[in-house]
Design a protein with these regions (language model features):
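Carbohydrate-associated surface elements
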Residues: 80, 101
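Conserved acidic donor-binding segment of nucleotide-sugar-dependent glycosyltransferases
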Residues: 248-249, 253-260, 269-275
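Nucleotide-activated donor-binding/catalytic signature segment of Leloir-type glycosyltransferases, i.e.
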Residues: 154, 163, 170-195
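Conserved donor-binding/catalytic core segment of Leloir-type glycosyltransferases
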Residues: 122-147, 161
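Short hydrophobic beta-strand element within catalytic cores of glycosyltransferases
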Residues: 33, 205-208, 226-229, 233-236, ...
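Acidic donor-binding loop of glycosyltransferase active sites
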Residues: 6, 72, 184, 200-217, ...
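Short, small-residue-biased leader/transition segments that mark boundaries at the very start
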Residues: 1-5
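A short, well-ordered alpha-helix in the C-terminal region of glycosyltransferases
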Residues: 125, 184, 262, 269, ...
């Protein structure tokens, strides 16, 4: 029988998996790597009122830190998450940032789908678009408020395309009616996976208005990298996990988190200036291709 020799165990969050991997590595006398893609308890705190004050939340955080300390090396998804580990006593020399990335061959600058553009009556409009889950921490209510301010100021120059579904859908639809934005906002609901690219092609500006919650400060989604690779103008809130991705004014725009007025101002600047939109979109794609393809990021692990 041929035996396959392993020299390390690589485990991904959360601590339930990571601690098992670290202990197994110790028992076998080999190295362990713990990859922290997020803190489960932080996500739960956005869904369960009062959870962040519970013993389970406190224990989960402590066990995440202990797992990182036990492991020989730790990868974190953001610099902000790395900084938290260092503050909690994990030695900085054994932590590397392993960020999200994108396949730049899959996400490219595409021509707009003219049939869908006509169907949605988006012709000659600048399209602000979000594709993803409708959950509280994404801040889509802030986006609606910003679009209301924007519409009052610049009129009928843009449309807001919201593709997806989730817990806040009803609240967002109600807010749209209350703000009298029915002619501006299009809700598609959930769409088939093979149709997503058609909707994505219509988007000029991709806002990520995540709220100033701890989970948003520490964890980055895939969405910003996909938007940048596609040549969209990324407009993110100033939460650390997103702001560290963008060079403000060059590869995207950053607005003050939880501030719809500042978001409206940033959106206005790129709606009114096509040249600026084009420049930022091209810069964003170039930066992602040169720094955040999966091929490049995976070499840090290998």
């Amino acid at each position: 029988r041929q035996m396959c020799i392993r020299d390390r165990i690589h485990s991904a969050s959360n601590f339930v998996v990571g601690m098992a991997g670290a202990k197994a590595a110790i028992a076998l006398g080999i190295k362990s790597i713990y990859e922290i893609r997020g803190f489960w308890h932080l996500t739960q705190s956005t869904k369960r009122i009062g959870y962040e004050k519970s013993d389970h939340y406190t224990l989960s955080e402590r066990l995440e830190i202990e797992t990182a300390k036990m492991s020989d090396h730790v990868f974190t998804i953001t610099s902000a998450l790395r900084d938290i580990l260092i503050q909690e006593g994990v030695h900085e020399d054994k932590i590397s940032v392993l960020p999200n990335a994108v396949d730049p061959k899959k996400f490219t600058i595409k021509k707009k789908d003219k049939n869908l553009e006509k169907q949605l009556n988006f012709k000659d409009k600048v399209v602000i678009g979000y594709i993803g889950s409708f959950v509280k921490y994404e801040g889509l209510d802030i986006l609606l408020e910003a679009c209301s301010l924007l519409h009052t100021k610049i009129g009928d120059m843009f449309r807001l395309l919201l593709v997806g579904d989730g817990d806040t859908m009803t609240t967002l639809r109600d807010a749209t009616r209350l703000l009298q934005l029915e002619d501006i906002v299009t809700f598609t609901g959930r769409v088939n996976h093979d149709e997503v690219n058609k909707y994505y092609s219509l988007i000029d500006i991709a806002p990520l208005p995540r709220k100033g919650l701890r989970v948003c400060e520490l964890v980055s989604p895939l969405k910003p990298f996909e938007a940048m690779a596609s040549g969209k103008v990324l407009v993110t809130s100033s939460v650390k996990a997103l702001a560290e991705i963008v060079e403000d004014g060059e590869t995207g725009l950053v607005f003050e988190k939880d501030n719809p007025k500042d978001l409206a101002n940033k959106l206005e600047s790129v709606i009114l200036d096509k040249s600026l939109r084009d420049t930022i979109g091209k810069n964003a794609r170039k930066w992602v291709v040169e720094n955040h393809s999966w091929d490049l990021v995976s070499k840090k692990v290998i």
